[in-house]
Structure formats: C-alpha cells, structure tokens
Amino acid sequence: MKPSNPIQTAEDQLDSQQQHASLRPWASLRYRDYSLLFLASLFVTTAQQMRQTQNFYQVYELSGSAFQLGLTGLAQGIPLFVVGLFGGTLADFVDRRKLLLLTIAGNFLVAAGLGFLTTTGAIRVWHVLVGTALTSGLNIILNPTRMALISRFVPRSHLTNAVSLNSSVSQSAHFIGPMLAGLSLAWMSTGYAYLFNALFYAPAAAGIFLLKIPEMPQRLRENFSMRSFLGGFRFLWRQPVVMTLVLLDFTIVGVGYYRPLLPIFAKEILNVGPAGFGALSSAPAVGGMLGTLLLLCIGDIEHKGLLALWSFLSYAVGLGLFALSGNFWVSLLLLGVLGLANSLQAVMRQTSFHLLTPDHLRGRAFAVFNMFSQGANSVGATEVGFLAALIGSPGSLLFGCTVGGILTLSCWAALPGLRKFGSEKTRRAAISL
C-alpha cells in the first residue's frame, strides 16, 4: 500500500524508473530527506558565498593591498589540495549526518570568531587569512559529504532532476550570497556582518539534524587503509566516462577561465565602467540559472554524455567569440552562453557521478571531483594571467578556445561510449567505452 504522504523516502520507490519521462521541475522535493538537504544546502552555500565576499572586502579594507587579496585566495586554495582526499574519506567512513553537523558548527564558530575580533577592534589581516583557510578546510569536508547524500534520498529516475535542483542552489547562492554580503556591509559594521553570516548556519544545522539517512548495507562497508584512502582516484581510473568528463572540465574550464580577465576586458576593450563590469561578472550566473531551469523543465536526459560534449564544445566556441568581441552587449550575451554551457555540463557530470559511483565510495569520489573542479579555477587563473601578459587577454582566451575545441572533438571521435552514455538503460554499456 502506497503512503498517503506526498513526502516519501527514496527507498519507497527505488524501482519507479518509468516516472523519469514526465518529472515535474520540483519532483525530487517530494522526498522528505532530499527536501531537507536541499534547504540546508541553500543556507550553507549562501553563507559560504557571503563569507567569501566579506573576507575579501575586509582584507582590502584592512590592508589596501592587492597582494594581500592574492594571499586570501591562496589561503582558500591550499586546503583544497592538502586535505581534499581526507575530507572525502571521512565522508565514507564517518556518520555523514554527524560530519555535516560538525562542519556546519565549525563554520558558525569561524564566522562568530571573526565577528567578535572585528567588533572588539582586535582583528588583523592574518586572522582573516586563518579564518579563510579554516573555512576552506571545513567546506572541503562538508561539500563532498553533502553531494554524496543526494542519491541516497531519490531513486535513479530522479537523479538528473535532483542534481539540477542542487545546481540551482549553487547558482542562486552566487547571486544571493554576495548581494547579502554587500547589503550587510553597507547597513552594519563588518563585525556585525560576520555575525549575521553566522546566523545562516542555524537553519542549515536544523535541516541536517532532521535527516534520516538509510544505513549502508554491511556488504558495502570497508575498513580504512591507504588503499581505501585512494579509492576515489582508483574509481576514476576504472570508469572512463567519469574520468573523461572530469579531465575535460579541468582542462577546458582551466585554460578557458575568463573571470580573472574580465576587469581588463571591461576597462580596456569594451570601455565600460564599474556598472558594466558588474553586469559582465553577473552574466554567467544568469546563463547558469537558465541552464538549470531548462534541465528542471525537461527532466531526465537520455543522452547525458552527448549533452556534456555539446556543452564543452559550446563553451570553447563561446569563449573564442567573446575574445574577439568588441561590443558590450554581444559580450554580455556570450558570457551568458558560457554560463549556460558550463551549467549543463556540470549537471551532466554530477549526474554521471551519482549513476556510476557506489555509495561506499561516493564521498571519496566527490572529493576528487571537487579537487579537479575547484582546482581548475586556481590553475586556470594562473595560466590565463600568464598568457595574457605574454600575448594579451584576447589571445589568452583564444588559446583556451583552441585547446578546448580540439580536446572536445578528439574525445567525441575517439570515445563513442561517452557519446552513448545516458540513462540507466545505457549506463552499463558505456562504462567499458
């Protein structure tokens, strides 16, 4: 007998694959635990974006130094490579709900600590750098753990929808977080802005506390060892679909990481002021939100690999056209296309991860996923800046366009299994490529 409550657990309908063709945009929110995770993720991700904006603002306010801003970015990036795998391993060997609660509590304490130091006048730049590094380390544990839970709460037929909704959280947070940070800094002191940020972790913790996470079957459990610690890398190596998508993202987004060059394009090429620069910076997020909305309306995608390849190719072409554009409105549109393409391939990558990764490996696999995904931005910022100094900003992005286009077309031709990878029906055949 089916439950009358519209909020159901994923275990109730694990075999409801026939529903995937007509899913509503909010279908995954019918599942109680996924909806709780969704709301908690919204508060956590918004708070993360708020804090990042507040940290950069305060460092510049205290030092007036661009070099110190660079150190802030370094403090944020180093923990990614130092403790990234450790965070994913914890997600697979420690109770995930407790792990989420601990990392959320840690984020709250960092925000409250920075707020206290600022309001008392004791704050120094190094305090903010340490707080940034601590926050980054906590989030390296929090984010893979949170992502690993998605497929525990919805059936496979809902995975694309669930991941798309999760992507909408990220896209929304990139708007809401910086906006709230700016408003809080304008309306109150920096110290109270940090305390305001800390409040966002309370509803997130409440949502996580109410989660009912299905226990992992005994046969899937394993003991901790160095071999298990490296399980995420071994999984990637043995799954050509996932490995290819991760490397495509790392390379194409890395060599085509345009964001550090936007101030140059705004001032020297498009001749627009701060307002124009703000519009250029926001355009990719608008495109990303449109991409997420499109996937939510369509539902499950039969040819996930093919859509990912088209998205990578569109990103490369859009990047080249943006590099050549001298018109502000055309550039604005092209940046929206870049955000749209990046959003589509990101959802396809994450969905493929969930489809192909066993639950006992999911935390470690998503830790590697995050290392490559976020590492692409750090490596890309260095690469495009160096090339821009040598051959100019347009030349740097044209190089990224060329590399991205060649790499995507090569994978398209050489890996037919990637093109065919899609829903559950084609999953097994695509694994072997």
Task: Label the model's feature ranges.
Residues 60, 150-155, 160, 267, ...:
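Helix-terminus/helix-capping segments at the ends of transmembrane helices and short amphipathic helices
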Residues 55, 141-154, 344-357:
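Intracellular juxtamembrane helix-capping segments at the cytosolic ends
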Residues 57-63, 115-120, 176-196, 268-270, ...:
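Transmembrane alpha-helix termini and helix-breaking/packing motifs in multi-pass membrane transporters
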Residues 19-79, 234-282:
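Helix-loop boundary and gating motifs at the non-cytosolic
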Residues 148, 152, 190, 194-224, ...:
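Helix-loop junctions on the cytosolic side of multi-pass membrane transporters
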Residues 131-172:
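Cytoplasmic helix-loop-helix junction between adjacent transmembrane helices
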Residues 42, 123-141, 250, 330-344:
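Hydrophobic core of transmembrane alpha-helices in multi-pass small-molecule transporters
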Residues 2-6, 72, 82-86, 93, ...:
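C-terminal transmembrane bundle of multi-pass solute transporters/carriers
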